[in-house]
């Protein structure tokens, strides 16, 4: 025991040291998490830095979001404060799990150490351990005697079972039958007398024989049995009171009528037909109350038959209901032959009564419809001399029609394409409408008017005829183009421009003169040829026709031009300001003598005449230098040109100012000296620009060169042909 206690105490000490170590580890991680939350908020944190073991100095922590986390065996990793916080949380979770395990271990060692002393497993103090002596020989002797006694007991039980009667199972069944009989008779099994129970059990086989005897009875014996039963009923009826006697008679009559099939139970509608108006108003309310009370007491057979009837048309409901009643009555006859009064027979009687009421309702509705049709015929053929009779018929019909009913189930309307609305609602009652006849005879003011005017009910055939007449009216009076509107739009949008080509053959015959026709109207085929020649000689300035074209399309598409016209059309209009054109400066020579001036030099012009003299001198000098250079260096004048289309090349406009691009080698060459032509060209361009700025209106657009062209800088306007055609159709 001492060694055991020493081992347990040593284990408890080890557990305590481990618990302390893990708690310190947990506290370190918690403080680290708090510091990380604090340092991550700022870029730098002021701290006291230890110097040695006893000295501190103020310092500052920088890069607080960059940390170096230490792992096992001298491994470190650089990470952010967020990642370092996750590592600390993981270590904190690990420490909590270890502390839980250490707590469980500590509890286990404590129980092993203190439980034996607390529960009395080990004696302590005045306690003494219980010790029992065990002798193996005496124990074996007791076992032998025990086996012998058990064998004798088993043999005794076997003899008792053999001595018991064999019909023990029959006794159990007999007792169960007695219990069932007492429950059926409503007897209390605890208070019943055994002698009375014995007598009842002895009379049971006699009853069974009597029950089986009617199967083999003759007609005479059956009549005698009926007479005995009637005599017993008569004796019982004498003992009953007057009210019980009346109820019994009505029940017997009802059963006999149901069995014979001669039931004619008057419905509530017929019973109220002869009463006055006050009773009439109250009867439907009571009838509805009764229906509401009977809805919960409906038999299952009645509910099933009514559901089947709701699926049938009105014409087939009455035969179906009569067939079901016939089947139920036959079933009641079979049951009554076996047992005169039983629960099943009473159940079928209730079912038959409910179905008879439904049959009377159907018959009543058919009579109402027939009476309404007769009233319509009478109203159509009535004479003005009989207003009193007409009023009486209306009052009688109104008394018979007074009814309030509610639907038992929700009706579902299925829309079918091939059927009319009247066919979809077979049970719906159509609302009658008043017919106003213009040619009807006028009635005297004193004659009483009927309460309501009934019109002939529209049938399915009448509705179909009206639909056919409407379709014929649409075909005759509505345009076909309205039905085919989509095709008409497509034809107009996809139409083509067809050109008629007429070929002419010139004949040498002399045409006969005609004075009765004008020149514009062709009178014979030769006039077409003359007209064609005239139109051909006339210059055609019109825009070419495109297939599927529309008005204004020439502003979008590229016109067909010749090469010369194409060059002038696509030429940049801004290039005309850079072309030298000496013909723009015009001088008119006058015959007057110019005055002499001595205060000016020859190079500076003093008046317009000086401009002209300088222009003539420079022109003569320029032509003389060109002629000398052309005579010396013009090898092409003596040779033939290699261009096959030289005339077309000469006619094409060329950019005179276009100069070859200079390479790197000619960058350092001197600039060409300006001549008089350059000054004149610049002056003409300046005057032209100034003239346009001064004389033209500021809002007027800049003139374009002749010819049709497309502005490449402007985006093309996309025009939908369908929208264009639709706009034309609207106009």
Curated annotation (Swiss-Prot):
Biased composition (Acidic residues): 285-300
Protein's GO biological process: intrinsic apoptotic signaling pathway in response to DNA damage by p53 class mediator; negative regulation of intrinsic apoptotic signaling pathway; negative regulation of transcription by RNA polymerase II; spermatogenesis
Changes seen on gene knockout: Embryos hatch normally but first instar larvae show very little locomotion or feeding and die soon after hatching. Embryos show transcriptional defects with reduced expression of ebony and Ass. Somatically-rescued mutant larvae show defective germ line cell viability and differentiation with damaged DNA.
Subcellular location: Cytoplasm; Chromosome; Nucleus
Domain of life: Eukaryota
Pfam family, one: Prefoldin
InterPro entries, sorted: Prefoldin, Prefoldin_subunit_alpha, RNA_pol_II_subunit5-mediator
Regions of compositional bias (Basic residues) in chain numbering: 661-673
Region (Disordered): 205-224, 259-302, 370-396, 508-527, 567-682, 694-731
Entry's Gene Ontology cellular component terms: cytoplasm; nucleus; polytene chromosome
Polar residues: compositionally biased ranges: 205-217, 508-518, 575-599, 623-644
CDD domains reported in the protein's UniProt record: Prefoldin_URI1 (cd23159)
Recorded GO MF terms: chromatin binding; phosphatase inhibitor activity; protein phosphatase inhibitor activity; transcription corepressor activity
Keyword annotations of the record: Chromosome, Coiled coil, Cytoplasm, Nucleus, Protein phosphatase inhibitor
Coiled coil location: 91-115, 143-176, 220-258, 357-379, 452-477
Biased composition regions of type Basic and acidic residues, renumbered to the chain: 611-621, 721-731
Keyword Transmembrane helix: no
PANTHER family membership: RNA POLYMERASE II SUBUNIT 5-MEDIATING PROTEIN NNX3, UNCONVENTIONAL PREFOLDIN RPB5 INTERACTOR 1
Quaternary context: Interacts with serine/threonine-protein phosphatases flw/PP1beta9C and Pp1-87B with higher affinity for Pp1-87B.
Family, as annotated: Belongs to the RNA polymerase II subunit 5-mediating protein family.
Name listed for the protein in its UniProt record: Unconventional prefoldin RPB5 interactor-like protein
Gene this protein is translated from: uri
């Amino acid at each position: 025991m001492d060694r055991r206690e020493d081992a347990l105490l040593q284990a408890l000490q080890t557990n305590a040291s481990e618990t302390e170590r893990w708690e310190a580890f947990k506290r370190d991680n918690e403080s680290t998490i708090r510091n990380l939350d604090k340092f991550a908020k700022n870029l730098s944190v002021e701290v006291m830095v230890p110097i040695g073991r006893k000295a501190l100095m103020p310092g500052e922590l920088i890069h607080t979001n960059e940390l170096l986390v230490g792992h096992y065996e001298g491994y470190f990793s650089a990470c952010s404060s967020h990642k370092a916080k996750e590592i600390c949380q993981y270590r904190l979770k690990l420490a909590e799990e270890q502390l839980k395990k250490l707590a469980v271990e500590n509890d286990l060692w404590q129980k092993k150490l203190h439980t034996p002393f607390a529960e009395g497993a080990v004696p302590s103090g005045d306690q003494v351990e219980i010790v029992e002596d065990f002798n193996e020989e005496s124990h074996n002797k007791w076992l032998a005697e025990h086996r012998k006694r058990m064998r004798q007991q088993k043999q005794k039980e076997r003899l008792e079972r053999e001595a018991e009667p064999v019909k023990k199972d029959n006794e159990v069944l007999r007792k169960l039958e007695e219990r069932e009989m007492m429950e059926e008779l409503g007897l209390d099994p605890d208070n019943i007398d055994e002698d009375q129970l014995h007598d009842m059990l002895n009379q049971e086989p006699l009853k069974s024989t009597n029950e089986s005897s009617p199967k083999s009875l003759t007609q005479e014996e059956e009549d005698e049995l009926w007479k005995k039963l009637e005599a017993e009923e008569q004796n019982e009826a004498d003992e009953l009171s007057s009210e019980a006697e009346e109820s019994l008679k009505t029940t017997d009559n009802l059963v006999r009528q149901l069995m014979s099939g001669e039931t004619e139970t008057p419905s509530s509608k017929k019973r109220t037909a002869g009463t006055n108006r006050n009773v009439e108003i109250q009867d439907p309310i009571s009838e509805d109350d009764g229906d509401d009370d009977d809805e919960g007491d409906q038999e299952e057979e009645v509910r099933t038959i009514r559901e089947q009837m709701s699926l049938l048309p009105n014409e087939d409901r009455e035969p179906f209901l009569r067939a079901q009643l016939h089947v139920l009555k036959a079933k009641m006859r079979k049951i009554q032959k076996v047992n005169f009064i039983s629960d099943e027979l009473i159940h079928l009687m209730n079912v038959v009564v409910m179905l008879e009421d439904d049959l009377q309702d159907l018959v009543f509705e058919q009579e109402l419809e027939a009476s309404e049709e007769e009233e319509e015929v009478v109203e159509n053929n009535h004479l003005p001399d009989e207003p009193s009779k007409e009023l009486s018929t209306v009052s009688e019909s109104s008394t018979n029609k007074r009814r309030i009913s509610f639907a038992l189930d929700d009706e579902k309307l299925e829309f079918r394409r091939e059927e009319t609305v009247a066919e979809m609602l077979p049970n719906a009652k159509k609302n009658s409408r008043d017919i106003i006849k213009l040619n009807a005879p006028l009635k005297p003011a004193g004659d009483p008017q009927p309460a309501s005017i009934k019109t002939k009910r529209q049938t399915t055939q009448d509705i179909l005829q009206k639909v056919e007449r409407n379709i014929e009216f649409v075909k005759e009076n509505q345009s076909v183009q309205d039905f085919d509107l989509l095709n008409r739009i497509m034809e107009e949008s996809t139409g083509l421009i067809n050109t008629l080509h007429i070929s002419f053959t010139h004949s040498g015959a002399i045409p006969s003169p005609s004075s009765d026709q004008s020149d514009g109207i062709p009178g014979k085929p030769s006039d077409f040829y003359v007209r064609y020649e005239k139109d051909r000689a006339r210059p055609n300035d019109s825009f070419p026709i495109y297939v599927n074209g529309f008005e204004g399309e020439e502003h979008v598409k590229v016109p067909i031009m010749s090469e010369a016209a194409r060059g002038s059309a696509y030429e940049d209009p801004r290039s005309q300001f850079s072309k030298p054109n000496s013909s723009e400066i015009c001088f008119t020579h006058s015959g007057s003598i110019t005055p002499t001036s001595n205060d000016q030099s020859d190079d500076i012009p003093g008046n317009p005449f000086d401009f002209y003299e300088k222009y003539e001198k420079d022109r003569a000098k320029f032509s003389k230098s060109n002629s000398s250079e052309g005579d010396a260096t013009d090898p092409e004048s003596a040779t033939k040109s290699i261009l096959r289309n030289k005339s077309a090349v000469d006619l094409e406009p060329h950019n005179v100012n276009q100069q070859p691009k200079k390479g790197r080698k000619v960058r350092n060459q001197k600039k060409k000296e300006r001549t008089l032509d350059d000054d004149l060209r610049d002056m003409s361009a300046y005057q032209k620009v100034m003239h346009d700025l001064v004389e033209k209106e500021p809002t007027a657009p800049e003139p374009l060169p002749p010819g049709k062209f497309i502005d490449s800088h402007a985006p093309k306007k996309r025009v939908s042909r369908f929208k264009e055609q639709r706009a034309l159709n609207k106009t």
